[in-house]
């Protein structure tokens, strides 16, 4: 079951990166400006290291699924629904990079009606829940901290770009 989960998550991330590349091309044709380029490689690296850490901790420490695995898995699936709701709500404006088309109105539909950054909430929950599924507490704690640091930089950069270039 562990390797199936890892395979699903890796395929999901690869598909999201492909969508992000397509969306980047679309919005750049509309005049999108990229922000936060300097921290972007750190975000990619953190996500790769998250998976490597999770695999290492589960295998080397012979971690087994939590006795609460069914409930945790149900929450993870619910979080995925929010992920794709956010992605679909942004349409071509969804990206892993900070790309802002000057003068375009901020999206206020889907989960963006209630939250400014629902996809970041999804990532926070995934970094907590996926390791929790296998009792990989070291990975959960370390990467929650790394993610918090990176998101504090990223969200500030994104908010500044949106504030400056988007129509409210």
From Swiss-Prot:
Q: What is its main location?
A: membrane
Indicate how the chain sits in the lipid bilayer: Multi-pass membrane protein
Keyword Endoplasmic reticulum tagged = no
- Keyword field contains Transmembrane: yes
Name where it's found.
Cell membrane
Q: Which residues cross the membrane?
A: 1-21, 41-61, 68-88, 123-143
The UniProt keywords, alphabetically, are: Cell membrane, Membrane, Transmembrane, Transmembrane helix
Gene Ontology cellular-component terms for this entry are:
plasma membrane
Q: Which Pfam families match?
A: ICMT
Q: Name one GO molecular function term.
A: protein C-terminal S-isoprenylcysteine carboxyl O-methyltransferase activity
PANTHER family xref list? BLL3993 PROTEIN
Name of the protein in question: Uncharacterized protein YpbQ
Lineage of source species: Bacteria, Bacillati, Bacillota, Bacilli, Bacillales
């Amino acid at each position: 079951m562990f390797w199936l989960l890892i395979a699903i998550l890796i395929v999901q991330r690869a598909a999201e990166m492909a969508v992000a590349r397509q969306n980047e091309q679309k919005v750049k044709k509309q005049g999108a400006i990229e922000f936060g380029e300097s921290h972007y490689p750190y975000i990619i690296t953190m996500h790769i290291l998250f998976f490597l850490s999770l695999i290492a901790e589960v295998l080397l420490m012979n971690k087994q699924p939590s006795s609460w695995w069914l409930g945790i898995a149900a929450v993870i699936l619910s979080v995925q629904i929010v992920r794709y709701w956010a992605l679909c709500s942004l349409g071509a404006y969804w990206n892993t990079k900070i790309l802002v088309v000057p003068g375009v109105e901020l999206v206020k539909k889907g989960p963006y009606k209630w939250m400014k950054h629902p996809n970041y909430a999804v990532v926070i929950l995934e970094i907590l829940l996926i390791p929790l599924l296998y009792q990989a507490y070291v990975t959960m704690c370390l990467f929650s901290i790394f993610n918090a640091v990176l998101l504090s930089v990223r969200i500030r950069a994104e908010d500044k770009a949106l504030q400056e270039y988007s129509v409210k």
